[in-house]
Amino acid sequence: MSDVNAHLLAQRIDTVLDILVAGDYHSAIHNLEILKAELLALAADDAEQKNQPKAPWEI
């Protein structure tokens, strides 16, 4: 299971908010798209790990 660092995530969201306040909407949207892609990749890794068959000693 992946470990999402809540503090790091909050910092990245804060950065996007700062960019929005500065008026650079294109960069803010781009940063949100990057963050979304990274979070979806983490979720996909979690789902892939959960779907792997367990070894007989793990059942």
UniProtKB/Swiss-Prot annotation:
Say which species the protein is native to: Klebsiella pneumoniae (strain 342)
What would be one Pfam family of this protein? YciZ
Top-rank taxon, per record: Bacteria
What protein name is recorded for this chain? UPF0509 protein KPK_3153
Checking NCBIfam families in the record gives: PRK13658.1
* Matches recorded under InterPro entries: UPF0509
Q: Which family does it belong to?
A: Belongs to the UPF0509 family.
